[in-house]
């Protein structure tokens, strides 16, 4: 499948995978890509498959000459679902912001190398962390 930008989707998936453990291929559809990061374990006592994590997820949409994004901070529960919830621990928020900025920078640089831009979605008004320079 070729995206509106003219790039084959399979090649983009390969490049996105090389950015790190972020892309969830099974949740990517058509010209939309899904990334997430399980940044901070809520409690290490449960068995690994039953742990919950604080983290973020990002939806990326391919358009003609750009990719647009929207993201959320929240909880990845033991069933494997994301829920947007307020996070009150300063250290956790700082870690989420750091990992999101790091990923955003790598993603932006990759897209620039392909002569594409990365911008917030037109309807993404609630950007808790400013990412674009």
UniProtKB/Swiss-Prot annotation:
Keywords, in A-Z order: Activator, Coiled coil, Cytoplasm, Transcription, Transcription regulation
Gene Ontology BP term (one): positive regulation of DNA-templated transcription
Record-linked InterPro entries: Tscrpt_reg_Crl, Tscrpt_reg_Crl_sf
Compartments where located: Cytoplasm
Pfam family, one: Crl
An example Gene Ontology CC term for this record: cytoplasm
Residue ranges that the Swiss-Prot or TrEMBL entry lists as coiled coil: 90-111
Region (Essential for activity): 99-122
Gene3D superfamilies: Sigma factor-binding protein Crl monomer
Similarity remark: Belongs to the Crl family.
HAMAP family listed in its UniProt record: Crl
Function, as annotated: Binds to the sigma-S subunit of RNA polymerase, activating expression of sigma-S-regulated genes. Stimulates RNA polymerase holoenzyme formation and may bind to several other sigma factors, such as sigma-70 and sigma-32.
Name of the featured protein: Sigma factor-binding protein Crl
Gene that produces this protein: crl
């Amino acid at each position: 499948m070729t995206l509106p930008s003219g790039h084959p989707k399979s090649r983009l998936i390969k490049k996105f995978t090389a950015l790190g453990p972020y892309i969830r291929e099974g949740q990517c559809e058509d010209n939309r890509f899904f990334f997430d990061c399980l940044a901070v374990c809520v409690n290490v006592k449960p068995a690994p498959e039953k742990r919950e994590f604080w983290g973020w997820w990002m939806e990326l949409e391919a358009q003609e000459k750009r990719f647009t994004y929207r993201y959320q901070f929240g909880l990845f529960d033991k069933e494997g679902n994301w829920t947007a919830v307020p996070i009150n621990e300063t250290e956790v928020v700082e870690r989420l912001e750091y990992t999101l900025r790091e990923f955003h920078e790598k993603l932006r640089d990759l897209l620039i190398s392909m002569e594409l831009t990365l911008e917030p979605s037109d309807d993404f008004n609630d950007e808790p962390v400013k990412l674009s320079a």
